[in-house]
Amino acid sequence: MENKENIARLIDVAKRRIGSIDINGLNSIIDPNKDNMLKKNTRELSYKKEKIVRSIGASRSTLPDKGRLNEKFFTKVNGNFHSIYMPEEGSFNAGIVRYNKEKLICVYRPDEYNFIGCYLDNNYNVIKGSYYKFKINNCADPRVLWNSKNQLILIYSSVDKSEFSKEHICGTVIIEDKESGVFVDRPAFRISPINLEGRQKNWMPFTYNNKIHLIAHVNPHVIYELNDNNVCKKLYETKWKSPWMIKESLRGSTNAIRLDDGNYLSTFHTSMNHRGKLYYDNGCYIFSGKPPFNVLKCANRTYLPAEAACEKHFRKANDIVCNFPVGMIVEDNKVIISYGDNDTLVKIVEYKLEDLIKTMVDIY
């Protein structure tokens, strides 16, 4: 029975990670006559005459282990950190947006498949009776922002029938009328064009000229516009030289926010393999407030490194060391970022804007 449960669990992990399973390969791993290939759900493989322990099913199993950089790069900016304990153990990766002077709206992941919305007070306490479970499923990483009609739009990545190779960006209205503030379920609409190749994840929304725009890629900086009919069109693509020390793809994190000077603050993360786990490190950047939205500044050190994750894993203990920012609010000199710590707990941190800017250098 235990062996069958392990097999089912491994199949589920493989489906979620790669969208398909090599049954023969899986059988070779779980074959009782090949116990040496299975030890605490890991496998050993040789790379340049070195043995590297990998998690079963992870795409990083074919990649070399990369050493972590020096402490001058892995910096943690001082901030006020808050843990948000939701009713569902293991809740993580929340998006946030300001509702009014007294309240914020938070949408988080109670598990790996669903979203729940709630209200927070200014001390980040959940307001009693405000929880609402949305009917959306097979969804990840909620980012929220108000549109010009005072509707709250939820933007997220979605998969159909666990086909992760076809992951795409969707949106839906979750509050029809800001004055009422009532959560609703409305039909979802596809945002990322169907003709785009590869998985589409972590598109970062922002508002420009009362229209929702989205950053599909950080470098090159690729910008789409979502029109009133929910049709998404690519507008701009600009290349720039990144000062970020980790030479991996810069991936989107939080929504972008317009600053007082008219430019936008945004964030990104990179993922690197280290000792069989994926380490997620976070940086920020500033881009122009005018088309084509050129990148003006970018971090050359982290504001929230992977090692700052401190929660005991509820899931993925053998897979990740991760702080994953999703939501951002900027109020005067205060930057409020919501994130998931090790895919285990919702957290919110307050930074001084000037401290984040100090992590960046000019882009020419």
Give each language-model segment a name.
Residues I96, P142-V144, A256, M328:
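Hydrophobic core register within WD40 beta-propeller blades
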Residues M1-L63:
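Membrane-proximal basic amphipathic "stem/tether" segments
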Residues F314-I329, N333:
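A short, acidic, amphipathic alpha-helical segment used as a generic capping/interface helix at domain edges
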Residues I29, K40-E89, N93, V97-N137, ...:
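Beta-rich carbohydrate-recognition and catalytic domains
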Residues G252:
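Extended ligand-binding clefts on enzyme/binding-domain cores
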